[in-house]
Regions:
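C-terminal domain-boundary segment and adjacent tail
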Residues: 28-31, 35-99
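Alpha-helical scaffold elements lining the catalytic groove of polysaccharide deacetylases
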Residues: 1-30
Length: 99
């Protein structure tokens, strides 16, 4: 995941529901893989209208949105990695972090 989730940035600094979409779009780096986690309970329910506007704005900027699975070919080996508990600024509690 390379982009912050809604709950990680909303209400922090100057990010509000009015400028959330623009904020996330400003973080996208065209030359890199950008990964945004979408939560069904947020973008799919309580913020569905806002998420719909995000999708339209992304398309108007010619930003391609695809599921991560499209980058995997059949039988692609997945490397093993270790994880540990860690903290991420703006996130309550601990999260699993790849080490």
């Amino acid at each position: 995941v390379t982009l912050p989730t809604y709950d990680e940035v909303i209400g922090r600094g100057s990010v509000s529901e009015l400028n959330y979409n623009e904020y996330i779009l400003s973080l996208i780096k065209p030359e890199e893989l950008n990964v945004l986690t979408v939560h069904a309970e947020v973008e799919g329910i309580s913020c569905a209208t806002m998420f719909g506007r995000f999708l339209k704005k992304a398309r108007s900027k010619e930003i391609a949105l695809v599921p991560l699975g499209t980058f995997l070919q059949e039988n692609t080996p997945v490397e093993k990695s270790s994880i540990e508990r860690g903290k991420i600024h703006g996130r309550d509690g601990w999260v699993s972090i790849q080490v």
